[in-house]
């Protein structure tokens, strides 16, 4: 059976969801990406992360942020970007993701190499993500945005969270 999330129609829908507006631009390796700024709750320094057994390598574990347990995914590893050693600009972007199947929004942390800036992209700046032939999982992208001569890949954190943290995990972390 074919995964409907990988269909051309699903890709077109995701590209249409790359709304014009403000994006927090981040770096993973040498590449630049964008996260909708309205999803971002805060940016924190990299802190100790508690590993969770039987998780894939890109799920680094959980952190305790003011009494809430928050799952943390290393976006570098998730996107196949060679992850060098963590450094002074490596940080965790804490975002509010929408749970699948109409669940309540919850906090979700992603490790990034650096935060660049907040950029504004007009509708004309955003195009659908091209088909990379399986090299990149486009389910996690909402589009590509032009910024001068550069191109920023726009990330769908809701899709990443839905793929990484199963619904059962949300009940394991009440109040998160």
Feature names for model-found ranges:
Residues 1-176:
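An acidic, low-aromatic, low-complexity terminal/linker signal
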């Amino acid at each position: 059976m074919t995964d409907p999330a990988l269909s051309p129609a699903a890709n077109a829908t995701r590209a249409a969801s790359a709304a014009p507006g403000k994006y927090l631009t981040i770096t993973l390796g040498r590449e630049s990406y964008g996260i909708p700024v309205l999803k971002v709750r805060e940016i924190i320094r990299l802190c100790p992360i508690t590993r969770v057994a039987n998780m894939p390598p890109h799920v680094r574990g959980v952190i305790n942020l003011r009494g809430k347990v928050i799952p943390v995914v290393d976006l570098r590893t998730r996107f196949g970007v060679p992850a060098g050693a963590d450094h002074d600009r490596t940080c965790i972007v804490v975002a509010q993701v929408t749970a699948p199947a109409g669940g309540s929004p919850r906090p979700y942390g992603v490790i990034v190499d650096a935060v660049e800036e907040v950029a504004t992209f007009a509708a004309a700046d955003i195009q659908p993500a091209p088909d990379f032939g399986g090299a990149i999982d486009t389910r996690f992208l909402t589009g590509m945005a032009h910024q001068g001569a550069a191109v920023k890949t726009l990330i769908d954190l809701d899709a990443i969270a839905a793929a990484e943290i199963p619904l059962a995990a949300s009940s394991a972390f009440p109040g998160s």
